[in-house]
Amino acid sequence: MRRLEPARQQYSWGSTSAIPALLGRADDGSPWAEAWYGSHPAGPAQVAEGGVLSELIDAEPERLLGEDIIWRFGRRLPFLLKLIAPEQPLSLQVHPSQAQAAEGYALEDEAGIALDHPCRNYKDTNHKPEMVLALTRFQAVAGFRAPRRAVEVLAGLDSPLARRMRRTLRLNPTRYGIRQVFSDVVSSATRPSPQEIDALVTEIAARFEAGTSPSLRVDSNVVKMADTFPGDPGIAAALLLNPVTLQPGEALFVPAGSVHAYISGLGVEVMASSDNVLRAGLTAKHIDVPEMLACVDYVAAPPVRPAPEYLSRATRAYYAPVDDFELMVTTVVAADGRLPVPGRGPRILLAVEGAVTLVTQTDSQTLAQGEAVFVGADERSLFVEGEGTLVQADVP
């Protein structure tokens, strides 16, 4: 087992206190948006004995990853585990499929765009499906609503923008209508002016305050977005998306192509090891609307909220329809004694509550809240004892 120190990501939308509180660190007043526990080159975790996790894996891939993982994914850790703590809405974004990521990366390389250039879309060749597990109440928007539900949200609004959006969806209540409205709202040639967005927000804020909203969550999200990014077209686009509220212990899966934005809360996120993000609004970062639109799945569907499957009294698993990762949560009390932790290496385990001791054939490590370890494939069995909760990312 190797203890890990996460890579800190100080994105402007991050809370200054949520992650430090979990990790037992002082709040230094700067955003701590994400804590990365993985080997991605954009933020590899530090190993307590020295160096970073990616170097450790590069030195002994067969032992730490195992032949099966190398055959399936190459000589790299296929997943990335994070803590994520949005205090302000994230960008309206989508992640590419495997084929789109590989093609986009190659084209940008051919064009000579440096990996660290702010206008680079594709930082790697991998797709980025992801799943977030709420540790506190967690708000998001994810995936397109059914057109009729979007029309209901727009009903009663009299601003020119609301009328245009409503008219298009009524004339074409299909995914093609959704595609037209969404692309019209975010594309540079057709997007509404800041004044039109402000007029729409004024109407929505008024009905929210009056208690006459057809969807309190949608209107609340719009008001939050407008407070942070006034006049941004992404505010109008969010009216087309499903509102999501996760309570602690609930999960949301976001597949490639799903337009989404996290809004507030603290969660554990696991994903394919990638940093590919295509944005269309609600951000000061690089926006490439045509590339983003090319990656979007316009099929309306409810959010994917995986139900936990109980593998034992202590462990529940959240399965995603991808091969790169799965997420497990194990909660133990002292009376349980020593219990097996399902799964296999390579895996990363993060203590999110209490204090627990992990035991392998060759090692024993006690983790306080906020501490994490990497367990290689050579450690075939893992046990836990103590009083606390562990979140584990591994490969199915």
Regions flagged by a language model, labelled:
Residues M1-G211, A284-P302, L327:
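Transition-metal
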Residues S30-W32, R76-L77, E87, N126, ...:
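A short beta-loop-beta micro-motif enriched in histidine and acidic residues
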Residues V47-A48, A59-E67, G231-Q247, V341-P342, ...:
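A short beta-strand-loop-beta hairpin characteristic of the jelly-roll/cupin
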Residues K82, L90-L92, D124, E130, ...:
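His/acidic/aromatic-lined binding-pocket segments of jelly-roll/cupin-type domains
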Residues I84-P89, P96-A99, N126-E130, T136-Q139, ...:
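Ligand-binding loop in jelly-roll beta-barrel domains
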Residues A205-S273:
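Acidic, glycine-rich loop-and-beta core segments that form the ion-binding/anion-interacting portion
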Residues G265-A317:
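C-terminal, non-catalytic macromolecule-binding modules
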Residues L311-A314, E326-G343, Q361, A368-Q369:
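Conserved short histidine dyad/triad with adjacent acidic residue
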